[in-house]
């Protein structure tokens, strides 16, 4: 799979990659820098962190319960009025679910890759997801591909990857957030979060926190048309002693724009990345 239009990504987001693929016998990426190296290279960018991946949901509680069951994460009340999931391991960000009356229109620009340790483990993950309300979907994947493509109760696409995928090795169960996006937007998020690029070839990019956790990847052209506000977006925030305005100014300088989606007077700043994807810059925390 990889792309949700059925055309596989060349490398980064190809859900059908096999361990025997010559491209992926070894992870084809820049080596993850050490802490000292990371500070030398990205130290001036360490002014915000990825706080949450936010879902617009018609039924936030139901969707949160689904993902809590699939991922094994703890469900808690969110201080902003939604529902949040706290990860069972230190991936660095949470999931948050907020009410929305908007219906899903077309594929999301982001989807999830969940890994498997064995074929039995893959089957168990699929069965668990189906039992919680997922459904099989056909996005043009080929019969010989080993991954399983599903959608959550509100249509959010995700793939359960077969065992032996070298690209996702050591990334954990929730291994990748695979996005439709340009090379420019991959470079933007590398600078925005201070996460190094672990792939940057053929207009495909991927980043990963120096602490580990899932990769975030962008598959390059052609880009999906944007149909209204994205149902998934990032919340980022400066650290406790940071400066929200300074962070917003920095993000504008590397390609973001401030946008108005009718948010009114709120404490956060709504912005869009170079591909037009909305995200929010919260107050320091």
Q: What positions do the PLM features span?
A:
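Vicinal oxygen chelate
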Residues: 42, 48, 55, 93-97, ...
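Short hydrophobic/aromatic beta-strand micro-patches
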Residues: 56, 113-117, 178-180, 235-239
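Hydrophobic, helix-prone linear segments
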Residues: 22, 38-92, 96-108
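Short, conserved charged micro-motifs
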Residues: 61-65, 119-125, 184-186, 241-247
